[in-house]
């Protein structure tokens, strides 16, 4: 990327998922930030501001819901220019968003006199098209504002950002599906080390557990098929312009089988891609005996 190539980051997503933190983070990175700009004014903003401030961040949400249809027309036109565009979509689980609204004592903009959950569900429907087109999806359900800021700074800092990252995540279904996952694989069909007394307190990071999980013929066969599938799929996602691919591997609690497979897949692809391994429910796993 040329140093002076104009850049536009579109920040969107669920109300309460962290757009204010995101906008503050982009200001710290030297972006010219505009909140709630009608999409039809984007070309004029870029033309006027882009001459002196080549990095622009714009937050668009359901406050501009009357302009959502026009946004996608403008977005497709801008993609045909020399402008480098990335769309960041911020999301969080419904229960987390409801809690945040109650803590802030604010009503949801789409349900000012009703339950926040009603507004959240309406908003998800309205923003579905944005989520599908976003190059980067961040689930803020289980992270604090400072951690979100650090993640944004790392992702968008020039010279440090990795063009394409494969995020391999283990998780437990009983703790909820990861909202930012692109691919989800269910490992609950494999024999569960939880029922082996000496393995129960351990995790997939322990050799005894990983050896137990991978010893079964069905585990070996599934692993081979999974590697073959990812070898095909990862380049397809990269070609689509995504900045990352989140591969989520789940078992019941996120403690044994999912961690074993996440570690194995990470090692399998570490020499081909920039790999980030995230054991989402590891803290829960260590607490469970």
Curated annotation (Swiss-Prot):
Keywords: ATP-binding, GTP-binding, Nucleotide-binding. ATP binds at residues 13-20. It comes from the Bacteria. GO terms for molecular function: ATP binding; GTP binding. Displays ATPase and GTPase activities. It comes from Exiguobacterium sibiricum (strain DSM 17290 / CCUG 55495 / CIP 109462 / JCM 13490 / 255-15). The keyword Nucleotide-binding applies. GTP binds at residues 61-64. InterPro entries: P-loop_NTPase, RapZ-like, RapZ-like_N, RapZ_C. This is Nucleotide-binding protein Exig_2405. Belongs to the RapZ-like family. Pfam families: PapZ_C, RapZ-like_N. NCBIfam families: PRK05416.1.
């Amino acid at each position: 990327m040329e140093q002076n190539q104009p850049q536009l980051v579109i920040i969107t997503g669920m109300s309460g998922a962290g757009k204010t933190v995101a906008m503050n983070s982009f200001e710290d990175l030297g972006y010219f930030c505009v909140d709630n700009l009608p999409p039809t004014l984007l070309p004029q903003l870029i033309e006027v501001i882009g001459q002196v401030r080549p990095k622009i961040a714009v937050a668009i949400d359901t406050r501009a819901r009357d302009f959502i249809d026009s946004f996608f027309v403008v977005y497709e036109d801008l993609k045909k220019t020399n402008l480098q565009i990335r769309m960041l979509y911020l999301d969080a689980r419904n229960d987390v968003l409801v809690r945040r609204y109650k803590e802030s004592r604010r009503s949801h903009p789409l349900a000012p006199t009703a339950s926040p959950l009603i507004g959240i569900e309406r908003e998800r429907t309205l923003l579905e098209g944005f989520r599908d087109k976003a190059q980067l999806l961040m689930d803020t359900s289980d992270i604090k504002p400072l951690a979100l800021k650090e993640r944004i700074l790392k992702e968008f800092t020039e010279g440090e950002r990795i063009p394409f990252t494969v995020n391999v995540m283990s998780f437990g279904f009983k703790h909820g599906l990861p909202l930012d996952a692109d691919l989800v694989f269910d490992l609950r069909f494999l024999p569960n080390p939880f029922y082996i007394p000496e393995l129960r307190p351990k995790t997939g990071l322990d050799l005894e557990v990983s050896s137990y999980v991978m010893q079964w013929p069905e585990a070996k066969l599934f692993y081979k098929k999974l590697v073959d599938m990812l070898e095909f799929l990862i380049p397809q996602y990269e070609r689509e312009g995504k900045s990352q691919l989140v591969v989520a591997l789940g078992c019941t609690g996120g403690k044994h089988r999912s961690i074993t497979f996440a570690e194995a897949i990470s090692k399998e692809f570490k020499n081909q891609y920039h790999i980030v391994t995230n054991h989402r429910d590891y803290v829960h796993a260590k607490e469970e005996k």
